From Swiss-Prot:
Name of this protein: General transcription factor IIF subunit 1
An individual GO BP term: response to virus
Family indicated by similarity: Belongs to the TFIIF alpha subunit family.
Residue numbers spanned by region Disordered: 178-466
Post-translational modification: Phosphorylated on Ser and other residues by TAF1 and casein kinase II-like kinases.
Amino acid sequence: MAALGPSSQNVTEYVVRVPKNTTKKYNIMAFNAADKVNFATWNQARLERDLSNKKIYQEEEMPESGAGSEFNRKLREEARRKKYGIVLKEFRPEDQPWLLRVNGKSGRKFKGIKKGGVTENTSYYIFTQCPDGAFEAFPVHNWYNFTPLARHRTLTAEEAEEEWERRNKVLNHFSIMQQRRLKDQDQDEDEEEKEKRGRRKASELRIHDLEDDLEMSSDASDASGEEGGRVPKAKKKAPLAKGGRKKKKKKGSDDEAFEDSDDGDFEGQEVDYMSDGSSSSQEEPESKAKAPQQEEGPKGVDEQSDSSEESEEEKPPEEDKEEEEEKKAPTPQEKKRRKDSSEESDSSEESDIDSEASSALFMAKKKTPPKRERKPSGGSSRGNSRPGTPSAEGGSTSSTLRAAASKLEQGKRVSEMPAAKRLRLDTGPQSLSGKSTPQPPSGKTTPNSGDVQVTEDAVRRYLTRKPMTTKDLLKKFQTKKTGLSSEQTVNVLAQILKRLNPERKMINDKMHFSLKE
């Protein structure tokens, strides 16, 4: 080489020989510097191919002849591949990775993966210096990157799945605890809402424990609930006189609602109470045995009203006119009796002022004329009636009293009457009275004017389909369809549910009723 400058004087020349025909193939083994590979410590090394992927490239072995063989299967398979452009990759052992073991089983393991495309655009050579100082250059055939293998035991698929589930549990522990806190907060809020609902007005339609109590929200249901507890006490106590009833009106209590109601509102309840007490066939012999002694003594209010109603019904129109004339012109004896009865009523008012008007039955009787108050045992309704009673008031309540009397007679003789006569008596008073509260007795249907009837069969059918709340049942029996008021529908449903005794379940903090088929 020619000297180009003072720096070129130290240049040395080397001879590089490249062999034309080489039987050996040279490959490069590349290790990462972080692995800290030290060849000086290698006492033993073993290098072998990893042929575990051979099964992937193997084709299914099918018999060419005999059972299970197909005619020209290989030719047809090749034609199919050419049609769809499928190119099969052959299994080439030289392309498989290397496995390097250093210093036996206890040593390290490396896996060398072939680096593709290294020799496509570049050429790598390995230079070896010969004894004469010249270099021999051998071309690099392949390049392998070696990475160390993990020494610890790897997990199987099942073990890995178990570990993954455990990992999810650990990671989700915080979220689970957070959900619990939120649930506790929701429960506290629900309890507060329940307390608030309990403090609300009783205007909501709800049916509580059917076995113990039927506490309905409407005023009519409250009145019917009070009737059951108050009527037995009313039997023992004498009714109050007219003066006591006037004072009660002045008090302005809740009972004023009953004063403003129409005629016949409590007719159904009166009949139920009276029929329950007198229609049982077992009590009839006892009452017959005691009848001679009781008839001689003073009669009670109910018996007097029954006898007076019977006498009124049996009288022809002419006798009614005569009775009215006699009322207008009172005799001196009647005046004397009237004074005695007023004194008795004042004394009874003072003695029984604490327990006045405890029954819905006597509330309903407030509309009746005062001639049916306390009477002597031998006197009739005509002799003890007060002359000052207006005739319009007696005419307005006559239909209600007649209906009550007929139903009382029906309850007393229910075991003796035939079915046809009983049916006639049932339908008669209802046509006379203006309104009547529907009470479902032993039968399954209730009389109503609408298309849909609130019957026990209908309620059973709804409850056997799916659990329902009382609100859902009230939606099924709407007032437009049944022809009943909301209070009447609530009463009928309450009695039907009490009779069916369905199962109760709490779903979303709401009481649901259901029946099994």
